[in-house]
């Protein structure tokens, strides 16, 4: 007898009938019907939204939708004061970002070095940096030092 598609049947025991919920204790899914006791998930409202955070304002509403922050693009300069140059460098010595890093006066170069005018300076130095404050520029040039802006 040839095998026909309409004669095919599932193997006995391979297909179980679905369990009907809430149809008595004997069914195994009576009383609470697999929903546990009380609580929001046991009620008839279904699932909680994926953005629900228990009543606090959710992150989607908290985050700004407009505007722009330039923080990731800002330039960060390593700062050195004039008083530091006075303390660690001798007369007519050249000061460069690499020398400052070597002497551990700055932790890292970042986007460059900025010289600020805190303190006093009494000896002329040749200072090479990316940016100088107005007071630092005046103090270095007043004692006969030279300033070179590097890019």
UniProtKB/Swiss-Prot annotation:
GO CC terms in record: cytosolic large ribosomal subunit
Entries under PROSITE patterns matching the protein: RIBOSOMAL_L15
GO biological process: translation
Annotated region described as Disordered, given as residue ranges: 1-51
Gly residues bias (residue ranges): 23-33
Pfam families linked: Ribosomal_L27A
Keyword terms, alphabetized: Ribonucleoprotein, Ribosomal protein, RNA-binding, rRNA-binding
Gene Ontology molecular function terms on file: rRNA binding; structural constituent of ribosome
Cystine crosslinks: none
Signal peptide span: none
InterPro entries assigned: Ribosomal_uL15, Ribosomal_uL15/eL18, Ribosomal_uL15/eL18_sf, Ribosomal_uL15_bac-type, Ribosomal_uL15_CS
Family annotation (SUPFAM superfamilies): Ribosomal proteins L15p and L18e
Subunit structure as annotated in this protein's UniProt entry: Part of the 50S ribosomal subunit.
Family in the record: Belongs to the universal ribosomal protein uL15 family.
Role noted for this protein: Binds to the 23S rRNA.
Protein name as it appears in the record: Large ribosomal subunit protein uL15
Protein's organism: Petrotoga mobilis (strain DSM 10674 / SJ95)
Lineage: Bacteria, Thermotogati, Thermotogota, Thermotogae, Petrotogales
């Amino acid at each position: 007898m040839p095998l026909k598609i309409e004669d095919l049947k599932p193997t006995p025991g391979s297909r179980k009938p679905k369990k009907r919920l809430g149809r008595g204790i004997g069914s195994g899914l009576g009383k609470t019907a697999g929903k546990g006791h009380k609580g929001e998930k046991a009620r008839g409202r279904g699932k909680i939204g994926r953005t629900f955070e228990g009543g606090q304002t959710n992150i989607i509403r908290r985050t700004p939708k407009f505007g722009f922050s330039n923080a990731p693009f800002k330039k960060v300069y390593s700062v050195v004061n004039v008083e530091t140059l006075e303390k660690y460098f001798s007369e007519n010595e050249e000061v460069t970002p690499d020398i400052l890093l070597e002497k551990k006066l700055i932790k890292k170069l970042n986007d460059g070095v900025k010289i600020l005018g805190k303190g006093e300076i009494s000896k002329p130095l040749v200072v090479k940096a990316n940016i100088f404050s107005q007071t630092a520029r005046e103090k270095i040039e007043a004692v006969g030092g030279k300033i070179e802006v590097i890019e």
